[in-house]
């Protein structure tokens, strides 16, 4: 019984790489197809932590205006409802936060708009 508990402890503490190696050995040497659920259970704690850390609020950060600065200024002006001077100051002050606390789809949309205008953009 103690041997089984020790084996179970070793099995639970395997890394993802080690689980993949074990699956390969079981398949090639013993003809056993490991169930996908067993691999998911082994990776469960790490996967659960990643899901818990998934962000729901994003900041759109303008890293640089690129070559088409005028187009980027126009895009920032329209996206943020700023005046021309404020938009230009934001673009000139890059890196700067264009908008904060956006949902993922809104942030992705704004990022795409700014990138199409020629800007280098990052989501944080």
UniProtKB/Swiss-Prot annotation:
Biological process according to GO: translation
Pfam families: Ribosomal_L12, Ribosomal_L12_N
An example Gene Ontology CC term for this record: cytosolic large ribosomal subunit
InterPro entries: Ribosomal_bL12, Ribosomal_bL12_C, Ribosomal_bL12_C/ClpS-like, Ribosomal_bL12_oligo, Ribosomal_bL12_oligo_N_sf
SUPFAM superfamilies cross-referenced by the UniProt entry: ClpS-like, Ribosomal protein L7/12, oligomerisation (N-terminal) domain
Domain of life: Bacteria
Keyword Ribonucleoprotein recorded: yes
Paired cysteines (S-S): none
GO molecular function list: mRNA binding; structural constituent of ribosome
Keyword Metal-binding found: no
Record keywords, A-Z: Ribonucleoprotein, Ribosomal protein
HAMAP family for the chain: Ribosomal_bL12 (MF_00368)
Similarity comment: family membership: Belongs to the bacterial ribosomal protein bL12 family.
Function comment: Forms part of the ribosomal stalk which helps the ribosome interact with GTP-bound translation factors. Is thus essential for accurate translation.
Subunit and partners: Homodimer. Part of the ribosomal stalk of the 50S ribosomal subunit. Forms a multimeric L10(L12)X complex, where L10 forms an elongated spine to which 2 to 4 L12 dimers bind in a sequential fashion. Binds GTP-bound translation factors.
Protein's UniProt name: Large ribosomal subunit protein bL12
Organism phylogeny: Bacteria, Pseudomonadati, Bacteroidota, Bacteroidia, Bacteroidales
């Amino acid at each position: 019984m103690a041997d089984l508990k020790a084996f179970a402890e070793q099995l639970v503490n395997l890394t993802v790489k080690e689980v993949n190696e074990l699956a390969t050995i079981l398949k090639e040497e013993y003809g056993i197809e490991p169930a996908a659920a067993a691999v998911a259970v082994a990776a469960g704690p790490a996967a659960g932590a990643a899901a818990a850390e998934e962000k729901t609020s994003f900041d759109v950060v303008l890293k640089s205006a690129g070559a088409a600065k005028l187009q980027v200024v126009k895009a920032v002006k329209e996206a943020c409802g700023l005046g021309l001077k404020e938009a230009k100051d934001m673009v000139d002050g890059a890196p700067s936060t264009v908008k904060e606390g956006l949902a993922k789809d809104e942030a992705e949309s704004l990022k795409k708009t700014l990138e199409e205008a020629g800007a280098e953009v990052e989501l944080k």
